[in-house]
Every structure is written in structure tokens, then in C-alpha cells.
Amino acid sequence: LLRADERERWTRILGEIAAHPDRLAQRRWQVSRAIVATWRRAGVPMMAGTDAPMPEVYPGFSLLDELERLVDAGLTPREALRTATLAPARFLGLEATSGTVAPGRRADLVLLAADPTRDIRNTRRIDAVLLGGRVLRRADLDALLQPPAMAARRTPR
């Protein structure tokens, strides 16, 4: 249960959000960009992450969105890619076996049609995935995405 002052505060905050959603979103984005820029200048390690599975946040796709936002916030595409590869391996203490492509390392790979270090949006141009020794070509990936896509179209909004 909320105290009366907490309820009043949340009523005011939610009213502001409902009245000015675009202004609030713009302000949050400005703050996020400033945080990323400050952390980058200070050398703070960053890891990409998402809130999947949450409504409207889809595993895989939400990570690609995150990488694009990190670049929009000032990271280079290479730095953004490291937030989803090497940084998590380091954080988990797996840097010796994961996080980069090298002989003897464990690796599931995403093969792209274009260089993501030139344009981070190229992470969406997936040609194939090597997963646990299996090769999944574009047609295989599209077939795997059919059931969730159909379910999403049936979900009421």
C-alpha cells in the first residue's frame, strides 16, 4: 500500500507522463545520451542489454535496437559491438574462452551481409547463424520466425 503522499506523487508523475509523453521521451533520451557520453569519457565499461521478454520488447531484435541507440548516443559502431560481445565475456569472467573470435574459443556466430563497424544497422542484415555447430541460413531463420510473427499479428493491441 502507498502512503497518501506517495500516491499523490505518483498521480502527479503519471499525469505528467500522460499529458506530455513526447516531451518526457525526449528528455529521457537527452539524459541517456549524456550518461553514455560521460561513461565513455571516463572509460566506464558498458554492456548492452534489454528488458526482453517484456511487452513490445523482443529478444534479439531489442538487442539490435540497443546497439543502434548506443551509436546514436555517441559510441562508435565498434564500441557498441563490444558492449554485446567482449564486455559481457569480461564481466562473466569468460574472456579467455568467449567474447571474441579466435582459435580455440567458443563461438556462436552471426554472419552479416555488410560490415557493422561501418554502419551499426548492418547488424540487421543477417545472412546466417552458426549455433552450436549448426548452420542456419537466412531461409532457416525466416522459417523459425514465422510462428512468433503469426502470434504477434494475432495479439490484440
What residues fall within each predicted segment?
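Short aromatic-centered micro-motifs
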Residues: 129
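Alpha-helical transmembrane segments of multi-pass membrane proteins
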Residues: 84-85
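Active-site neighborhoods of metal-dependent hydrolases
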Residues: 1-73, 139, 146-148, 153-157
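Short, charged, surface-exposed secondary-structure boundary motifs
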Residues: 121, 139-141
